[in-house]
């Protein structure tokens, strides 16, 4: 958050920053550093982990991953991410920026079965050329969802408002939305929140390797989370419908009176009134 300049997707959240990356080198031990950080995050009560990094190739190519290891259960870091989810956290991870390379697929830990993997689209909702693709080696839909990762507005280390590209930015955009949605439903599990997000996405019924399930609509996710099962009764009916003023409630012969309560889609009670056959309007 920057006053009068920038509001992120979870501006009132509390954050811990864990630096597990060795910027000068790329070695397998960094996966262990990440798992150690995830364990520490769990001990601190963290709900959502954002991971803006991924591992596939290492400086010593003998240790590099292969695509057949992107199965959600082989890489050390991915297994650590799965343990984090089993502890109740939501792990959000960048899909990777290798979409235009000879090895365009997702990297560790984006292959995780329970990890919410985020690819990148531009402001026109078109997948970027660099966004790594799926599926996982075992055929699961990856990435899971998409968020803006091209020309993302952000604050740099000096506090300047700039734009940048990468799934390293689409992932935290999504992680903030995840946190905000979970705040609306604090009693739901991490799996339930993830399911709400995926089922709200615009390609949920027709996913593919570039977009996964697509771009989530968090207003739909919120509505679905608040939803109740449809039901019908024959003891009364209301008219006119729709109305912007007075509404009449017609009770059946077996009902003489009752209490009518009206709730908004957010679950807030907006009206309550006793009604009867002699006083049927609200």
What are these regions (language model features)?
Residues 1, 15-22, 47, 105, ...:
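Hydrolase catalytic cores
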Residues 28-34, 38, 58-66, 93-113, ...:
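Active-site-adjacent substrate-recognition loops and nearby beta-strands
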Residues 8, 14-19, 47-52, 83-85, ...:
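Structural recognition of the beta-strand scaffold that forms the well-ordered cores
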Residues 71-88:
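Catalytic-core regions built around general acid/base machinery
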Residues 49, 141, 256-260:
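Short beta-strand/loop motifs in extracellular/secreted proteins, especially
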Residues 231-282:
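C-terminal outer-membrane/trafficking sorting elements
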Residues 209-227:
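A recurrent domain-boundary module in secreted/ectodomain proteins
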Residues 1-30, 44-47, 58-61, 86-88, ...:
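Subtilisin-like serine protease catalytic core
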């Amino acid at each position: 958050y920057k006053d009068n300049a920038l509001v992120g997707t979870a501006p009132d959240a509390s954050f811990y920053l864990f630096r597990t990356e060795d910027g000068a080198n790329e070695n397998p031990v960094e996966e262990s550093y990440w798992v150690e950080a995830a364990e520490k995050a769990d001990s601190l009560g963290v709900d959502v982990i954002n991971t803006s990094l991924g591992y596939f190739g290492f400086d010593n190519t003998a240790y590099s991953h292969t695509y057949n290891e992107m199965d959600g259960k082989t890489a050390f870091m991915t297994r650590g991410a799965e343990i984090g989810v089993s502890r109740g956290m939501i792990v959000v991870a960048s899909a990777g920026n290798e979409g235009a390379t000879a090895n365009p697929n997702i990297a560790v830990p984006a292959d995780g079965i329970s990890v919410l993997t985020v690819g990148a689209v531009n402001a026109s909702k078109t997948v970027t050329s660099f966004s790594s693709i799926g599926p996982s080696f075992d055929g699961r839909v990856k990435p899971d969802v998409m968020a803006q990762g091209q020309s993302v507005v952000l604050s740099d280390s000096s506090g300047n408002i700039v734009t940048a590209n990468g799934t390293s930015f689409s992932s935290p955009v999504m992680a903030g939305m995840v946190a905000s949605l979970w705040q609306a439903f604090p009693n739901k599990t991490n799996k339930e929140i993830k399911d709400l997000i995926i089922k709200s996405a615009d390609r949920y019924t027709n996913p593919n390797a570039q977009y996964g399930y697509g771009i989530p609509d968090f207003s739909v996710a919120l509505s679905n989370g608040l939803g109740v099962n449809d039901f019908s009764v024959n003891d009364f009916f209301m008219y006119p419908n729709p109305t912007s003023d007075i509404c009449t409630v017609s009770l059946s012969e077996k009902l003489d009176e009752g209490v009518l309560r009206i709730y908004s889609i957010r679950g807030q009670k907006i009206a309550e009134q006793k009604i009867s056959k002699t006083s049927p309007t609200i």
